[in-house]
Amino acid sequence: MTGMETVAETGPRVEEGHRTPVITITVTAVFTALVSASTFLFQIPIPSTQGYFNLGDIMIFISGLTFGPTIGGFSGGVGSSLSDAVGGFGTFAPFTLVIKGLEGYVAGWISQRSSSRGILLIAWAAGSIVMVLGYFLAESFFIALVFGSSDFTGIAAASAEVPFNILQVVGGGIVAIPVSVGIKHVIRSTAFSSRILGPLKGHTAKKS
């Protein structure tokens, strides 16, 4: 059998432990849509900062903790900023793109080599700090700049949203960590786990 016949029979080979581009694009698109929908459909406005409480962090953490930094970062940033843009909060969209993107990326980067609950908890905490601190700094600057308020007024208004943001990420972690563990467990039962999840420390894909 020639080399060409072998390729024709088996198809292109995918290096073990690496996601295929098709899977990456598909999962990214799905989670970008889920982040956007969960952010847009479940909102509680916060008048003091012109922002809103939402459930998007649940999906951001699920995508990052389960599928790593690329998918977590893209879906978090793009999905959340799209929701801002179409939901009447377009002035916040650039801040959201960066902050929520970093939230998903950091959580995914820390958790990508291990699936232990301890590492997932650390990854969630790091992503949460990025989100809460990022919005505090952005809103402090934005409120003072747009409304012509003093720096103190901007900080005071941004501080009013901190408890809501903390509640948002805590709720996201409570849901996302067990869901991520469950998704990984189900995927690992297949013969293609490393092609979906990517390489994980201490995990060997099941051989078919």
Annotated model-derived regions:
Residues 1-208:
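Loop-helix junctions at membrane interfaces
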